[in-house]
From Swiss-Prot:
Function field: Possibly involved in pGI2 replication mechanism.
Species this protein is from: Bacillus thuringiensis
Keyword Cell cycle found: no
Keyword Cytoplasm assigned: no
SUPFAM superfamilies: Winged helix' DNA-binding domain
Protein known as: Uncharacterized 23.6 kDa protein
Domain of life of the native organism: Bacteria
InterPro entries in the cross-refs: HTH_MarR-typ (IPR000835), WH-like_DNA-bd_sf (IPR036388), WH_DNA-bd_sf (IPR036390)
One MF annotation (Gene Ontology) recorded for this entry: DNA-binding transcription factor activity
Keyword terms, alphabetized: Plasmid
C-alpha cells in the first residue's frame, strides 16, 4: 500500500512551528515579554500621544563611553608559549594599546576625538619617550609577522613623505566588538591569515 503525504498539511504545520519559534525568540530577546504585550503597550502610548507615531529606545549606558582594548588571551598564550614575540615587541604592544581607535584598530593621536589622526612612527616614539629608530625596527618586525599593517595614504603635492596609518591585527588586540570586526580591518589583514593559521582563535 502506497503512503500518501498531504503536502498542504505538512506545509501548514511547518509554518505554525516557524511562527511559534519566532514568538519564542521574540520573548527571549525582550526579557520574557511577548509580541502581543508589546503591541498593547504601543497602542496605549499611541492613544496617550494623540495617535502620533511612537518610537521606543533604550538609554545608553554610561559604560558605553568607556574606551577599551581586548587582548585575545588564547592567542597571546600561544604567542608567548612559542616565543612569537620578542620582549621589546610585547612591551611595545602593551604600551600602544591605549592608542587604538575604537573599531578601526588604528594607532591614533587621540582615542576620544572624532577627528583623531593616525600617528606616525616619529609621533609614537615621542609619546613613548623613545627614539624613532627603535620604533621603526619594532614596527617593521611586527609588519613581517602580520601583527601590524602599514597602510599608505595620499601624498600631498610638494610633500616628500607619503602619509600612512598603522593598524593592529584584531586577532592579537582589538578595540571593538569581537563578533563584529570592521570589514575594512578584515581586508587589511586578509593576507596575514596564513601567518596565524596555528593560532587557536581567528576572529575572521
Amino acid at each position: 500500500m502506497t503512503n500518501t503525504i498531504d503536502f498542504k498539511h505538512v506545509e501548514k504545520n511547518a509554518r505554525i512551528r516557524d511562527f511559534e519559534n519566532e514568538k519564542e525568540k521574540f520573548k527571549q530577546d525582550h526579557n520574557g515579554i511577548n509580541q502581543e504585550e508589546v503591541n498593547q503597550a504601543m497602542q496605549v502610548l499611541s492613544k496617550a500621544t494623540g495617535g502620533k507615531e511612537i518610537f521606543i529606545g533604550t538609554k545608553r549606558s554610561p559604560q558605553s563611553k568607556v574606551k577599551f582594548a581586548q587582548f585575545i588571551q588564547d592567542n597571546w598564550d600561544y604567542a608567548l608559549e612559542n616565543a612569537f614575540f620578542t620582549d621589546e615587541e610585547m612591551l611595545f604592544l602593551l604600551r600602544i594599546q591605549r592608542f587604538l581607535q575604537f573599531k578601526s584598530n588604528c594607532i591614533v593621536n587621540d582615542i576620544h576625538s572624532r577627528n583623531a589622526l593616525p600617528m606616525s612612527q616619529k609621533q609614537i616614539a615621542d609619546r613613548l619617550k623613545t627614539d624613532k629608530s627603535k620604533i621603526s625596527r619594532i614596527v617593521n618586525s611586527l609588519v613581517q609577522k602580520g601583527v601590524i599593517v602599514k597602510a599608505n595614504g595620499h601624498k600631498p603635492e610638494g610633500v616628500k613623505a607619503r602619509t600612512y596609518a598603522l593598524f593592529i591585527n584584531p586577532n592579537i588586540i582589538y578595540s571593538g566588538e569581537r563578533d563584529n570586526v570592521e570589514t575594512t580591518l578584515k581586508a587589511l589583514f586578509m593576507n596575514s591569515k596564513s601567518l596565524f593559521k596555528k593560532f587557536p582563535i581567528a576572529l575572521f
